[in-house]
Amino acid sequence: MRSLFKKFIAIMTLSTIFITSANAVYVYRYQQEKTQWCWAASAQMIGHTLGRQVTQTDIVTQVKGMDINDGANDTEMKNAVTYATLRNSVLRSSAWPFASATNELSTGEPFLIKLTWYKNGETNGAHAVVASGYNIASGTLTVVDPGYRCGTKAFDYNSMITNCKFQSGTGKWTATIYV
């Protein structure tokens, strides 16, 4: 009987450790509707998760003043998240520490990650994705990519901030937008 009790306690302890080491926010994935609209799709996903339904066209028109297939700078992405969520958003011009990212996701709020692509050491474009979960034990963040033929996938945090092969390109996390 004692042995059975010890096994039960061990299983419960491991279960508790596992449950507290991982978390996920359900983020409905919207594919970007135009080739340069990853930022609008990412803002749309965050807005949807936080209870607001807006279209990518609405977001682009609000931020750019017209329906145009154009990328966005950091301030425009921040404005897109603010519009999509009707909440003030904050732009951090760098990656978050892993602990900050997991804390934000623990509150049930996904956030936008700007990925900067590099080729031969030079900046070669950028892409917006949404962080939706984490696993402390494996040191990963789950990313929802609005790009064509992409989806939801976990990536090693240390690779994300240095040089990582994401679903839609190779680069690193260079900015964060959260509410």
Residue locations for each model-derived region?
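Bacterial N-terminal signal peptides that target proteins for export
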Residues: 1-12
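Hydrophobic core
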Residues: 12-20
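Generic anion/oxyanion-binding catalytic loop in active/binding sites
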Residues: 13, 27, 90
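Active-site nucleophile-adjacent alpha helix/oxyanion-hole segment immediately C-terminal to the catalytic cysteine
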Residues: 23-67
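Conserved active-site-adjacent core of cysteine acyl-enzyme catalytic domains
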Residues: 47-49, 58-179
